[in-house]
């Protein structure tokens, strides 16, 4: 089963945060479906998020969570990205 790199954009007021996840799925369509199901519970405190295009709105549109990108990848490529973005190199 291939791996898919899921990029989620979370917007609260003017703040934009990106979250990256790895999902194993049979194809891109299934990966999107799994990602959207995960995103529905992205903010635990909101029991009734509103479905919007490619995502959900929480707290009466105060926080928008959208599926920004889905692409096939490998665990190795995803791990390299995480190491690159979370490693401090002062040289």
Regions of interest found by a model, annotated:
Residues 5, 20-22, 79, 88:
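Compositionally biased, intrinsically disordered low-complexity segments enriched
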Residues 8, 22-24, 58-63:
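Extended low-polarity, hydrophobic cluster-rich segments
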Residues 1-19:
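Short aromatic-glycine-(Arg/Gly/Cys) micro-motifs in beta-strand/loop hairpins
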Residues 37-91:
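Short, mixed-charge low-complexity intrinsically disordered segments
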